[in-house]
Amino acid sequence: MSIVYNKTPLLRQFFPGKASAQFFLKYECLQPSGSFKSRGIGNLIMKSAIRIQKDGKRSPQVFASSGGNAGFAAATACQRLSLPCTVVVPTATKKRMVDKIRNTGAQVIVSGAYWKEADTFLKTNVMNKIDSQVIEPIYVHPFDNPDIWEGHSSMIDEIVQDLKSQHISVNKVKGIVCSVGGGGLYNGIIQGLERYGLADRIPIVGVETNGCHVFNTSLKIGQPVQFKKITSIATSLGTAVISNQTFEYARKYNTRSVVIEDKDVIETCLKYTHQFNMVIEPACGAALHLGYNTKILENALGSKLAADDIVIIIACGGSSNTIKDLEEALDSMRKKDTPVIEVADNFIFPEKNIVNLKSA
């Protein structure tokens, strides 16, 4: 347990229909910020602040750029640690989220159409204007930092402890399902599994939505790619790139990748919300979708699940949606066919070897 994040429950979840396995949900939606990001971002901020305060020469101040959940996690951690915090969000960020961040006491600046533009503004127009003689900045990337991954890995410590307390062998765990955006959560899960010698024994199923499936595309191509635009409704998963560490881990370990459609995710979110009285956003619904659709999960794992097999789903949380948002999104999708973005038209390579890769 930490001052910046909560120990969350690992609970058995019964999904409708005939059970093909035992599902356990890790309820990261119960974090201070409503999402798993409180673990990693809180860890980064706390470690950095302790180091700066121990040095005693300057005062720590946090600077974050985010489309929502990461910025809110940073602001929430700073509220608990009594640290000043500035968050730059893009114009696409909902007013509800802007207000939530601001209500923690953080300064919120709205700039740029997308996260990358907000991040550039933060670095060039905010951070470079601070008095570096007095302030030592703590820059918070949404996902690409080892301290963030270290913080996320703590959920595996809790999972192992909870299984042990329930007298359940980790050998029964046939997979961990998580949503993948930039890869911060995924990296943390891998590092946690490595700590217990389980990384090469328990496969991870990474779930994305079509239109922000950078992880899936990178694995298919065989190298990290960058998307030109994000078209999925799961904006919390909407990053143009994954971290290099994510790609390396996925190549090293037995990771599976699943891509599902926005409409399916929204339907899952509403289904879960109505059944369990808990609002979830599409980024979280992507992982939960496999609990409702075990055939997809079994295809990803490459084997049938037995009744006593265990699958853990990370309910990663998020605070960007209301029930009304989900219902309006689904209604809009039903009125018109959502276009499928062709992968070949939506990514660029970091290197000029496309022809060689395609012919390989």
From Swiss-Prot:
CDD domains, per the entry: L-Ser-dehyd
Domain of life: Eukaryota
Record-annotated disulphide pairs: none
Record carries keyword Ribosomal protein: no
Residues carrying N6-(pyridoxal phosphate)lysine: K37
Enzyme Commission numbers on file: 4.3.1.17, 4.3.1.19
Keywords from the named record: Acetylation, Lyase, Mitochondrion, Pyridoxal phosphate
GO molecular function, one term: pyridoxal phosphate binding
EC primary class: lyase
UniProt-listed GO biological process terms: L-serine catabolic process; threonine catabolic process
Entries under Pfam families matching the protein: PALP
Compartment(s) where it occurs, according to its Swiss-Prot or TrEMBL record: Mitochondrion
Entry annotated with the keyword Zinc-finger: no
Positions of post-translational N-acetylserine modification: S2
Miscellaneous remark of the record: Present with 36600 molecules/cell in log phase SD medium.
Family, as annotated: Belongs to the serine/threonine dehydratase family.
Protein name: Catabolic L-serine/threonine dehydratase
Protein's organism: Saccharomyces cerevisiae (strain ATCC 204508 / S288c)
